[in-house]
Amino acid sequence: LIVRPEEIAFDVDGVFADTFRTFVDTARRDFGCDFSYEDITEYDFRTVVEIEEQASEAIIARILEDPIGSGIEPIPGAVDVLTRLAGLAPLLFITARPEETAIRSWILHHLPGVPGSAVRVVATGTGENKRSALLDHGVSCFVEDCLETGFLIDPYRVRPVIFDQPWNRKPHPFHVVRSWRQIAALLEWPRV
């Protein structure tokens, strides 16, 4: 699998942003929860970890409204690969977040070497709506952490690449990457 830079798009949370780790850290620190990152074995984490709904909603609201202030960090290796990639083609992020302003600010904050004009963010509001956004932008490959989205887009000739996380380790037919180095290996880079 080799992907042209202009034909790849990325999810944000769980692929570029280490959002779930921030969720776990905040739940433990601010709400006294006793679960670990590896305990999140379902994308809908509320079905597998013990957390009060009010606490969960408060953390999610904080993460959605202020990803920078929430302390979300990039997944290791992401900044380097995305900065290199932005030199070849505009970056495209497709997120199920309800709005793009806060997460676009987070992306630009963590990609200081990339001009804002080289970053496109599409907030779809739901995972189901990612398919049409991907098709509208001519994407042939999408790096995603949610298996359900993989199954939604695969029949439409958008190849899902699943970024390994504890919640997507069930059997599936998709290509898996475990690091940004592995993502970089999928890309068609210019010959030097």
Model-predicted segments: where are they?
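Asp-based, Mg2+/Mn2+-dependent phosphohydrolase catalytic module
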Residues: 1, 131-136, 141, 146-192
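Substrate-recognition element of Asp-dependent hydrolases with the DxDx(T/V) motif
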Residues: 67-74, 78-108, 124
